[in-house]
Swiss-Prot record:
Name of the protein described by the UniProt record: Large ribosomal subunit protein bL32c
Location(s) in or outside the cell: Plastid, Chloroplast
GO biological process, one term: translation
UniProt similarity note: Belongs to the bacterial ribosomal protein bL32 family.
Recorded superkingdom: Eukaryota
Keyword Ribosomal protein: yes
SUPFAM superfamilies given in the database record: Zn-binding ribosomal proteins
Length: 69
């Protein structure tokens, strides 16, 4: 037969929640730092691909418009 577990104290709950928040803050800080590094253009060890599809399509439409003029 199933027996209900003992209730977790407020202090344990608070400690666990604090640990969880600290982990989340650390991950967010790391991601933000990486994003700043990529956007600054000074990254030498981090490789990533740039998606230029949207810029190519906008350039082609602007070129087409200038040809008509």
């Amino acid at each position: 037969m199933a027996v209900p577990k003992k209730r977790t104290s407020k202090s344990k709950r608070k400690i666990r929640k604090t640990v969880w928040r600290e982990k989340a803050n650390k991950a967010a800080k790391k991601a933000f730092s990486l994003a700043r590094l990529i956007l600054s253009g000074r990254s030498k060890s981090f490789c990533y691909t740039v998606n230029n599809k949207s810029s190519e399509s906008s350039e082609s439409t602007s070129i087409d418009e200038s040809d008509d003029s």
